[in-house]
C-alpha cells in the first residue's frame, strides 16, 4: 500500500480548513485516513498550521511521500526536510 501525506478538506462552503493526513494514495480526497497528523486553516490571519512532526517523520521514514502542497507547508512552517 502506497501512503501519501496530503490535505483532506473539511469545513463549510467558502470556509474550508484542512487536515493533514496519512492516507492510501488511491483513496478519495475525503476517504478514511490511516492517521490524522495535523491541521491547516488557510483563512486564519496567521495561516494556522499545526502538525505532529514526530509522526510526519515516522511516515516519511517508512516510505510515505508528501504531496507537493503538504511538503511546501512543512518547509515553510517547520524545520523538517521532505524527501521527494
Swiss-Prot record:
GO molecular function, one term: structural constituent of ribosome
Keyword Heme set for record: no
GO CC annotations, alphabetized: cytoplasm; small ribosomal subunit
TM segment ranges: none
Single biological process term from Gene Ontology: translation
UniProt-listed InterPro entries: Ribosomal_bS16, Ribosomal_bS16_dom_sf
One Pfam family linked to the record: Ribosomal_S16
Family: Belongs to the bacterial ribosomal protein bS16 family.
This protein's name: Small ribosomal subunit protein bS16
Organism: Endomicrobium trichonymphae
Amino acid at each position: 500500500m502506497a501512503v501519501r501525506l496530503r490535505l483532506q478538506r473539511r469545513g463549510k462552503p467558502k470556509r474550508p480548513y484542512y487536515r493533514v493526513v496519512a492516507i492510501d494514495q488511491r483513496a478519495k480526497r475525503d476517504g478514511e485516513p490511516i492517521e490524522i497528523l495535523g491541521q491547516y486553516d488557510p483563512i486564519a490571519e496567521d495561516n494556522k498550521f499545526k502538525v505532529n512532526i514526530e509522526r510526519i517523520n515516522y511516515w516519511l521514514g517508512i516510505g510515505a511521500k508528501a504531496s507537493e502542497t503538504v511538503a511546501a507547508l512543512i518547509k515553510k512552517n517547520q524545520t523538517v526536510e521532505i524527501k521527494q
